[in-house]
A protein has these predicted regions:
Chain B
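Membrane-interface interhelical loops and short amphipathic "cap" helices
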Residues: 32-57, 108-130, 189-212, 239-242, ...
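Hydrophobic alpha-helical membrane-insertion segments
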Residues: 20-28, 96-103, 178-179, 317-326
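Long, contiguous internal "core" modules enriched in hydrophobic/ aromatic residues
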Residues: 6-13, 17, 21-27, 81-83, ...
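Aromatic-anchored segments of alpha-helical transmembrane domains
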Residues: 101, 185-186, 261-264, 321-331
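TerminUS-proximal long segments
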Residues: 306, 310-385
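Hydrophobic alpha-helical transmembrane segments
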Residues: 63-71, 222, 292-299, 363
């Protein structure tokens, strides 16, 4: 038995050495679809009517809101999307004045950004979240185990959770109206309803072109930044603003996609399981060596 | 062989075990609420702070503190230092109990407990959590397999299956021993990878792409101190001999492992320039100072002295500081350092979360005592020459 074990370990060592050549030479590559849809939100146009919230609620069959959608006093405090509302509109006063010298509000619609290389998708343990070819970051409740790693990973803190469901809680976030767009060929609920065309739906590349054209045509009206163009490697939802983004609730984000570092670590260490196999072989060889040595010592004693 | 594990002959029902029962009952009651009112009913978790102490302490610290299992297995079985076999069984028991409770903590923390098997079939290979889950799942199994001989020694005559498995394992145990070390290295490091995906949320004092390496080296470092701490507690509460003849030499290895961890950690801090915020008095920097100062630097210097390594009290103190330091490190990474920029209020653990955690710890102590009373785990007392 002992001898055969050594032979086996030797074979294992060879196997480990062969596997120890990882193909980690290839650098990390973005998995973003080439021509995703997107939405361009122009904050200079938004009038804060909350119609997009209402449309989203109806299209996605969400529960009745606590306060009716025509009640604008909800904007007195900052809100975040939650499990009952996939999008909310917040109001900011940045010191900007209107043409009658009164403080002018800026309204900001918040929802999932549908990142090009989403942290949530990379993190999800079961692949319940996926980036679709049309740009949607899609949630499949059938696979979800409720670990909430997507929530810990999302830089925009978007996925919301049904914390008061004891057995079957779901992760809730803007669906980009996936079925509506993909199967019915319609606009997302929010984009279709907006009375002032603050939300433009289209191919992300076209939207970026439009956004820069608007800035170029009226440089006094806009800050020269399309939020979402490069943030976290790019998002499908893009924003134009007349005031500094930092003043209306947008945080500065790295331009590297969030999953880049972790995915590089994971694939470098575990492609073809080379490192565990190599370690197993090395430890096996070591164990074989030490047990032979201690056995021969025992033999000496016996003699 | 110098060691000869025997069941401990000590009365089982003591005031201590009764206190543990009380904590266990409180924890169990909280779980009833958890499965009646949801996570929101008993925790302070919210959309910005989705992970609390059940992940930061029960899972992350739990995994780290079970490192005594694979580090002693490596020393005694793989390196062949049979002298240390006296502590492999208690370390194995702690690891098996620890990991079993890590799995239970995950089960309770995930919203859809009934779906816990799903990652086996729906695999996402870019997810560090997927790797942690697979390794922990496999490792729990491996640990209990490694424990079978202990069970068989006591029950083999009554349960033929155990005796049968024991005989098979006699020839194959080396596979499981190596597998245990490999799996430990994998998931100890992947546990550190988890929050690398959230650079905007983790404080720069802890955020580094080196987190996986730091988690791995700190797991190496905490292994023997954990064995020293638990053996000292067990031998003194069960009135056994102190086993200092094993623990003192064991502590010498920690000078190296803890030293490597300290060097990596301080080097990383300096390279990234993150030490700049160290004295700003924020909860983060204070917690970092305690973690590194009391948990790493001071005990490392203590261990340099032979008088400390030979004194039961001082060695216990140093080991306890290292154990506390690594626990605090996991807690810091997952809870203290985690700041969600969009959050409107911070996270503090709710009483329900604390009760469940305390209940889990009490159950581990309770079961440990139960096992050492029934099964041949500890070899103290008759081990002296
Ligand atoms: S915003 Fe968050 S939830 Fe939405 S795709 Fe990006 S990472 Fe995922
Ligand atoms: S909570 Fe669900 S969707 Fe989110 S990471 Fe976990 S399994 Fe994936
Ligand atoms: S795209 Fe659809 S789900 Fe998302 S905010 Fe608009 S209406 Fe709601």
């Amino acid at each position: 038995m002992k001898v055969s074990r050594r032979v086996f370990l030797g074979n294992l060592g060879a196997l480990g050495a062969a596997a120890a050549v990882p193909d980690n030479a290839r650098a990390w590559e973005s998995k973003a679809p080439p021509a995703p849809y997107g939405c361009l939100v122009d904050l200079t146009r938004c009038v804060g009517c909350r119609k997009c919230e209402q449309a989203c609620n109806e299209v996605n069959k969400l529960p009745e809101p606590e306060m009716p959608f025509d009640d604008l006093t909800v904007m007195d405090r900052l809100r975040r999307p939650d499990h009952r509302s996939y999008t909310v509109v917040n109001r900011y006063y940045t010191g900007r004045l209107d043409d009658r010298d009164r403080l002018a509000p800026t309204f900001v619609k918040v929802q999932c950004m549908h990142c090009q290389d989403p942290a949530c998708v990379s993190a999800c343990i079961t692949g319940a979240l996926t980036k679709k070819e049309n740009g949607t970051v899609h949630y499949d409740v059938e696979k979800c185990i409720g670990c909430r790693y997507c929530m810990a990973a999302c830089p925009f803190e978007i996925p919301a959770y049904e914390y008061h469901e004891p057995i079957t809680p779901r992760v809730r976030k803007c669906t980009f109206c996936y079925e509506r767009v993909e199967q019915e060929g319609k606009l997302p609920g929010c984009a279709s309803i907006c009375p002032v065309e603050a939300i433009t739906f289209g191919r992300r590349n076209d939207l970026l072109g439009q956004a820069h054209a608007r800035i170029d045509n009226d440089p006094a009206k806009y800050v020269d930044h399309v939020y979402g163009e490069n943030e976290v490697g790019g998002t499908s939802w893009l924003y134009l603003s007349g005031v500094s983004f930092a003043k209306v609730g947008f945080h500065e984000m790295p331009t590297e996609p969030m999953p880049k570092v972790t995915e590089t670590i994971q694939s470098t260490m575990f492609s073809y399981l080379w490192s565990p196999i190599a370690l197993f072989a090395a430890l096996g060889a070591l164990m074989g060596f030490t047990s032979r040595r201690s056995r021969s010592k025992e033999d000496d004693h016996d003699a | 062989m110098t060691h000869d594990p025997k069941p401990v002959k000590a009365p089982f029902w003591t005031p201590g075990t009764l206190v543990m029962l009380a904590f266990m009952a409180a924890g169990a009651l909280t779980l009833v609420f958890r499965y009646t009112f949801g996570l929101g009913g008993v925790t302070n978790l919210n959309n910005h702070y989705p992970w609390g102490i059940w992940i930061g302490l029960d899972v992350a610290s739990g995994v780290a503190l079970a490192a005594g299992g694979f580090t002693t297995a490596f020393l005694a079985h793989i390196l062949g230092r049979h002298y240390y076999e006296a502590v492999t069984r208690p370390a194995l028991l702690t690891a098996a109990l620890g990991y079993t409770f890590v799995a239970i903590a995950v089960f309770v923390d995930i919203g859809r407990s009934w779906a816990i098997w799903k990652p086996i079939f729906y695999q996402n290979h870019t997810s560090a959590l997927f790797e942690v889950a697979m390794c922990v799942m496999t490792y729990v199994t491996v640990l209990w397999i490694e424990f079978i001989p202990v069970l068989a020694e006591r029950l083999g005559s009554r349960i033929p299956l155990l005796a049968f498995l024991d005989r098979i394992l006699d020839k194959t145990m080396w596979i499981f021993i190596i597998l245990g070390v490999v799996l430990s290295c994998m998931h100890q490091s992947s546990l550190g990878t988890l929050l690398v995906i959230a650079p905007t949320k983790v404080s720069p004092l802890w955020y580094t792409p080196m987190l996986p390496l730091l988690f791995l080296t700190s797991a190496f470092a905490v292994g023997y101190p954990m064995v020293i701490a638990e053996t000292t507690i067990a031998t003194s509460s069960l009135r056994l001999e102190s086993e200092m003849n094993v623990l003192s030499p064991l502590s010498r290895f920690t000078i190296l492992t803890l030293g490597v961890y300290m060097a990596l950690k301080l080097g990383d801090l300096i390279m990234r320039g993150a030490y700049a915020t160290l004295l700003d008095g924020s909860p983060q920097s204070n917690s970092f100072l305690v973690e590194m100062g009391l948990g790493v630097v001071v005990p490392w210097f203590m261990l340099l002295f032979g008088t400390v390594r030979r004194s039961r009290r001082l060695l216990f103190a140093a080991a306890l500081m290292i154990v506390g330091g690594v626990m605090l490190n996991r807690f810091n990474v997952f809870v203290v350092s985690f700041k969600a920029p969009y959050a409107t209020e911070p996270y503090y653990p709710a009483i329900g979360e604390i009760l469940v955690t305390a209940g889990a710890v009490a159950t581990i102590f309770f079961l440990y005592r139960l096992f050492v009373t029934w099964f041949p785990v500890l070899s103290a007392r008759r081990q002296e020459v």
